[in-house]
């Protein structure tokens, strides 16, 4: 608001007004002297404030570069399983932010695992530090020492892509390896979403070899586990990769209580009461979706089941007695999934409405070539007594999983239509 002056006041107090005018004229010189004396300091403070702001701005950019470098290096470690070239990856990432190692005195340092912080014992954690000396301007009036700004970031690789995933979030022994079973996950990881202190349990002489083991809870029996990227407890739960997948609706019955002891080829459709293959059966499935409405897929010793581009759906039109699967000793299975369509990548598809813990068994001695995903999200799956999955691409996703026989998995899944379990992308943790 502007000041207001009143004419009456000027006439009433002329002496006072004249005195004030003379005082103002007398102070003009003093103001000039004070201003001259303080102006350098004021300008210095303004300049110093601007310089500190520039340091803060540079630190923010250094931090972005360090974050990117750590994520890039940790992701590379997750993919290749060793430390080769990690510093090169980190430096390439920081360079995209204008911080080129060796240029303008920029230094990029990498430690794997970190030398400080909460992840010094985490094998797949990578620490990146980016530093650069700053040129002093106004601050040189107060100090001549070198000022270096640094930014630090730590990223943890997620252990690579999974091929075995237990979805149960609370169970003890959501994944169990028992007996003398040897479970080999070639180039892929085991993931267990249970927060239980014994989420993954190895009993007896059972062994596990994997790219990594990622468990939300904890592990019982770590001495029998061999990994490339480490055992990660307290992990972030893995998402259900097929949560958005669905199978087409169905109705009626094309076959009732199908049973075979001979060589034959059958077509997609609804098989009410399931399928039973006995010794002497050599059944080939034409491509498509096979609905097992109640009953069981039973493949007994001496029987062979094969098919390319097939999905077997385990369901129930009544909401009761959901279909299951039982592959017994001496049976042979060779199945691969469709590569497109609503069930792409899925060779076994369990209805999400079936009771939790519905049993699916793959018994000892079975020669199994199961390509794609065994997606049984409510199932209690047992791989038992020497079951051997030799295909290059096998995923097992179930509520709980028990291995009591030798089992092999790999995820060379190009051309199978599968979806990845987990991600190779690392995440920032510090």
Indicate where each model-derived feature is located:
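Short linear sequence signals and composition-biased patches located at protein termini or domain-edge surfaces
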Residues: 393-430
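Short, ordered "entry" segments at domain starts
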Residues: 132-250, 258, 352-397, 401-406
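Short, low-complexity, Pro/Ser/Thr/Gly-rich segments in the mature regions of secreted, periplasmic
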Residues: 247-259, 263-264, 415-430
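Alpha-helical hydrophobic helix detector
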Residues: 36-50, 64
């Amino acid at each position: 608001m502007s000041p207001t002056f009143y004419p009456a006041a000027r006439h009433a107090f002329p002496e006072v007004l004249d005195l004030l005018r003379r005082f103002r004229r007398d102070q003009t010189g003093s103001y000039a002297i004070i201003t001259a004396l303080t102006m350098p300091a004021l300008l210095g403070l303004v300049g110093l404030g601007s310089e500190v702001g520039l340091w803060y701005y540079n630190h923010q950019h250094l931090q972005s570069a360090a974050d990117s470098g750590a994520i890039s290096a940790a992701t590379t470690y997750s993919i290749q399983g060793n430390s080769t070239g990690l510093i090169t990856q980190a430096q390439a990432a920081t360079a995209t932010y204008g911080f080129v190692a060796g240029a303008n005195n920029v230094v990029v340092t990498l430690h794997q695992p970190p030398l400080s912080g909460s992840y010094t014992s985490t094998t797949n954690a990578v620490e990146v530090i980016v530093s650069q000396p700053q040129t002093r301007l106004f601050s040189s009036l107060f100090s001549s020492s070198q000022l270096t700004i640094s930014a630090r970031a730590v990223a943890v690789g997620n252990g690579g892509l999974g091929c075995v995933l237990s979805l149960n979030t609370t169970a003890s022994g959501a994944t169990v390896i028992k007996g003398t079973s040897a479970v080999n996950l070639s180039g892929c990881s085991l993931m267990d979403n249970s927060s239980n202190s014994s989420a993954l349990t190895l009993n007896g002489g059972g062994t596990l070899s994997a790219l990594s083991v990622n468990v939300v809870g904890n592990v019982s029996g770590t001495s029998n586990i061999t990994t490339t990227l480490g055992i990660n407890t307290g992990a972030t739960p893995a998402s259900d990769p097929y949560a958005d997948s669905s199978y087409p609706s169905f109705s009626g019955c094309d076959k009732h209580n199908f049973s075979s002891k001979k060589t034959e080829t059958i077509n997609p459709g609804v098989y009410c009461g399931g399928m039973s293959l006995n010794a002497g059966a050599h059944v080939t499935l034409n491509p498509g979706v096979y609905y097992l409405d109640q009953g069981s897929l039973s493949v007994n010793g001496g029987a062979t089941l094969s098919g390319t581009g097939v999905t077997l759906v385990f369901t129930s039109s009544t909401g009761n007695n959901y279909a299951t699967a039982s592959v017994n000793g001496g049976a042979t299975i060779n199945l691969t999934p469709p590569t497109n369509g609503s069930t792409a990548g899925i060779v076994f598809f369990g209805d999400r409405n079936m009771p939790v813990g519905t049993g699916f068994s793959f018994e000892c001695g079975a020669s199994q070539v199961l390509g794609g995903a065994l997606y049984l999200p409510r199932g209690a799956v047992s791989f038992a007594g020497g079951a051997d999955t030799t295909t290059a691409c096998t995923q097992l996703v179930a509520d709980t999983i028990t291995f009591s026989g030798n089992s092999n998995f790999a995820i060379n899944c190009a051309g199978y239509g599968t979806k990845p379990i987990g991600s190779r992308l690392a995440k920032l943790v510090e």
